[in-house]
Amino acid sequence: MSFWRALLRETGLKGATRTRSADTTVPARAEQPVEKPAERPTGVSVPSPAPASGAPTEPLALTGAREEAARTTSGVAHAPAPTAGMRAASLERTLRSLVERLGTEHPDTITARNNLATKYAQMGRRQAAVQQFELTLAEAVAVFGEEHPRTEIIRENLAWAYEDAGRPADAAGQWEMLLRERERQFGSADEDTVEARMRLAVCYRRSGRLDAAVVHYERAIEDVASTERREELRLGLSAAQSMSGRYEDAIGQLRMVLAGRRRRLGKGHLDTLTVHHRLGRAYTQAGRSDEAVEVLRDAYRVALNSSGDPEVRRLTLRLRRDLAGAYNAAGRYREANALL
């Protein structure tokens, strides 16, 4: 076990568990005072940074019987829960106070700025979140160094903030650094290393670096331990291959995922039908019209028999439209018109 992995466990820092597709985002490692960015729900409220002076930085809330007694004796109605804007304002006040008392390069200030950036991200204030995470990372590097676990957490938060703000190229730069460090410390097959490689592949694909994306998807597929995550990676790989015109390779990946999901979930499951639909579209893109018709028709029939789920019903409509298009491409106009 590496030094930093041991320290992560001793200090309570750990990789947060979250299931996501290869096209979506994953949480940063968690520690008690350092929060995750937007849309990485952990179920933990924003913590206040530990005060250097020993005095609380925010008023403590009454709980349980004490809170009830306070309401009874005062006769005042219980105040409504604070809004996101109120929480952000409180975090802004906390940060200003810490900057004035301790300066910007103090651990408490760094924690407070990270928490404020997190709240901005949760509120959808993406640009403000990015700006605060950038400042937090610069301060963390100056105080803790590049390789400190807390710096890594903040760097991952910034990478996620860049992704949320539609800046995949900037996010890729952060994931590259995280991947190098995790590979050095933990090895290529470690769960967090694979996660960083997957996110790097996603960002490369979204920023148009398709060959690099394919390389990292393929490596992540080799290293990942989970069957479900391997399927997600294959879907991401197939998307990168399709975008680069490698339709036959994309079809091969989709066929493997479809076979696996049929075994695990059944052919009528939404996740299975979604891949079935993608396979039919891949055949259409490859100019294999007859096979596209066969695959899309099969998926459409299965969806019709599994349409109790509203999501399946919506997918059924898309399948019907794409099947009609495949019939047209194959010169089968009468069958296409019957679906329109």
Residue ranges and their predicted role:
Residues M1-L340:
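Intrinsic-disorder-linked linear interaction elements in eukaryotic regulatory proteins
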